[in-house]
């Protein structure tokens, strides 16, 4: 895979998209101005013609070194999804930048056409289908200053994800119990 094999899908409602200036000219770019992030990304995939798709936010900047590294990762892991690490404790990627083959998208299905959190839900479906997520530190890509999301929206997102994937609750509880068992001194539990 080379740069020319990638289409960058950028959802935006801004007249000037900062990200475009750091995308090499040999790449294809599809800017989508649909209402929700999920719908815009899905429309971008439909309009793209390349084997590889990169989701990118409209307010980031890539370095040539980052793109070279991502291409190397993709060539070594063609059946994985590569992206920026989510916010702890989430094991999922964020769509500020995410790269994958079109065939993976087709297998997982389109993103939910919501405003926020669509990539987390998509990554959950991806892992359930056996795809590996390769996380790159978020700091690898410059993110221009912007307004932060509201805490209440993050809580709504968690409840929405749990309503779609209730098995996450059980998996989370199992992980907590496992960590407690592995990290606690046996002395703590003696009477």
What do these predicted ranges mean?
Residues 34-48:
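Glycine-rich, basic loop-to-helix element that forms the pyrophosphate-binding segment
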Residues 53:
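Short aromatic/hydrophobic "clamp" motif used to bind/position activated sugar donors
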Residues 57-61:
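The conserved acidic donor/metal-binding loop of glycosyltransferases
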Residues 65-92:
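Conserved donor NDP-sugar-binding/catalytic core segment of glycosyltransferases
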Residues 116-122:
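Acidic donor-binding loop at a coil-to-helix junction in glycosyltransferase catalytic cores
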Residues 125-141:
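Catalytic donor-sugar/metal-binding loop of nucleotide-sugar-dependent glycosyltransferases
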Residues 136-154:
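Active-site donor/metal-binding and catalytic loop motifs
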């Amino acid at each position: 895979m080379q740069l020319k094999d990638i289409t960058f899908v950028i959802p935006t409602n801004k007249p000037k998209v900062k990200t475009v200036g750091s995308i090499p000219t040999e790449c294809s770019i599809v800017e989508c101005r649909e209402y929700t992030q999920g719908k815009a990304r899905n429309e971008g995939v439909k309009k793209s013609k390349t084997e590889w798709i990169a989701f990118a936010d409209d307010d980031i900047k890539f370095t040539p070194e980052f793109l070279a590294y991502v291409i190397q990762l993709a060539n070594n892991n063609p059946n994985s999804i590569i992206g920026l690490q989510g916010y702890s404790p989430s094991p999922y990627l964020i769509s500020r930048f995410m790269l994958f083959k079109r065939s993976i998208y087709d297998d997982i299905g389109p993103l939910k056409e919501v405003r926020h959190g669509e990539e987390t839900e998509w990554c959950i479906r991806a892992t359930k289908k056996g795809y590996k997520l390769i996380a790159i530190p978020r700091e690898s890509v410059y993110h221009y200053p912007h307004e932060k999301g509201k805490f209440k929206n993050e809580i709504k997102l968690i409840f929405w994800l749990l309503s779609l994937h209730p098995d996450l609750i059980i998996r989370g509880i199992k992980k907590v119990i496992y960590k407690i068992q592995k990290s606690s001194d046996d002395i703590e539990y003696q009477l």
